[in-house]
């Protein structure tokens, strides 16, 4: 079964077009494939405002500011799923408002920023982190490989 991306658009600042959804699905598929994971996962993706992501960041991470993306992994081990059962990889929450701001700041397209945030979040869902410098370098290297494969290079 192919990847399932369940979308919940809770913001009104930017219209989310089908082309963007397809790009984000490709980000999931490409990230999973790079890591050698089966593509048959469900990922929940919520588009929110800065205000909502700030509330979530405060609640779940104790950090009272708007961030760009939050990841909530639901999988530790891929061996524990019975045949045919839906595999829930996790939840991704993206502040579309923050993505617009960062695309302008980094002088690249909104689509490139959204693709980066999705790939970044996927690596968190697959167990990567960036608390230590060596972890951050490894995660960044993997993200750049996937983004390049998708054609989302820095402009």
Swiss-Prot record:
Binds 1 zinc ion. It comes from the Bacteria. One of its GO terms (biological process) is rRNA processing. Keywords: Cytoplasm, Endonuclease, Hydrolase, Metal-binding, Nuclease, Ribosome biogenesis, rRNA processing, Zinc. GO terms for molecular function: metalloendopeptidase activity; RNA endonuclease activity; zinc ion binding. Its EC number is 3.1.-.-. It is found in: Cytoplasm. NCBIfam families: rRNA maturation RNase YbeY. Belongs to the endoribonuclease YbeY family. This is Endoribonuclease YbeY. It comes from Alkaliphilus metalliredigens (strain QYMF). The lineage of its organism: Bacteria, Bacillati, Bacillota, Clostridia, Peptostreptococcales. The gene is ybeY.
